[in-house]
Design a protein with these regions (language model features):
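Catalytic Walker B motif of ABC-type/P-loop ATPase nucleotide-binding domains
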Residues: 156-159
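Conserved ABC ATPase signature
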Residues: 131-135, 139-141
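ABC ATPase NBD coupling module
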Residues: 20, 69-81, 105
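Conserved ABC ATPase "signature" region
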Residues: 112-127
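The feature captures the beta-strand-to-loop junction immediately N-terminal to the Walker
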Residues: 39-41
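A short, proline-enriched helix->beta-strand linker immediately N-terminal to the Walker B motif
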Residues: 150-154
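Helix-to-loop junction immediately C-terminal to a conserved catalytic motif
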Residues: 54
Length: 214
């Protein structure tokens, strides 16, 4: 595992009112085994940065490296898992089937059992057979987190993964993130929640299109 590296990331969005320079030469590195949080005010470009890092949006300049290679397209789920705010759960699959999807794509045995274990750890094991439309957004969010970590990717990028969780359910999500890092994953989490920041090894702050150390 080589973790995540980004160098000189630039991203400008063009609107009728003129260009908006969201990212201005962003450099960052997350080593295997690190949980790093990304802070910054709303609209500072955290989601835009995660999309570029995951390969789902193209930077205007700069490079992203994972698994020792420069990204030219979205990496496989074994290399990088992205947990966006738009969760992307498949409506025709149960929560357990959604969580197990990366394992089934990789033809890993015991996928539903592992998925159910993760859902239980996140406090929603009894909902494993429900469909996304039948549960709350916070419960969907926990299922999406389980799906992101189940395949043990080299890099995990998460955008506000505890934003819709209450004080009872958030600690389990934080433990799952911390455990992923402790197992060797490079974890970068955009968050406003103090509990996630406290569990992190360090915090980066995005402001004015640039990264500083929190």
């Amino acid at each position: 595992m080589t973790g995540l590296r980004a160098k000189g990331i630039e991203r400008t969005f063009r609107h009728a009112s003129g260009p908006v320079h969201v990212l201005r030469g962003v450099d960052l590195e997350v080593a295997p085994g690190e949980l790093v949080t990304l802070s910054g005010p709303s609209g500072s470009g955290k989601s835009a940065l995660l999309a570029v890092l995951a390969g789902f949006d193209r930077a205007d300049a700069g490079a992203v490296e994972m698994a020792g290679e420069v990204l030219t397209s979205p990496p496989s789920w074994q290399v990088c898992a992205l947990l966006p705010q738009a969760l992307g759960l498949a409506g025709e699959l149960t929560l357990a089937e959604n969580v197990a999807l990366p394992l089934r794509l990789g033809r890993t045995g015991g996928s539903l059992d592992r998925a159910t274990e993760l859902l239980e750890e996140l406090g929603i094991g009894e909902l494993a057979g429900r469909y996304p439309a039948e549960v709350s957004y916070g419960q969907q969010q926990r299922a999406a987190l389980a799906r992101a970590v189940v395949g043990r990717p080299e890099v995990l990028l998460a955008d506000e993964p505890t934003a819709h969780l209450d004080q009872r359910s958030a600690p389990a999500a934080v433990r799952v993130l911390r455990r992923a890092a402790d197992a060797g994953c490079a974890v970068l989490v955009a968050t406003h929640h103090d509990e996630v920041h406290r569990a992190a090894d360090r915090t980066l702050v995005l402001g004015g299109g640039r990264i500083s150390v929190g």
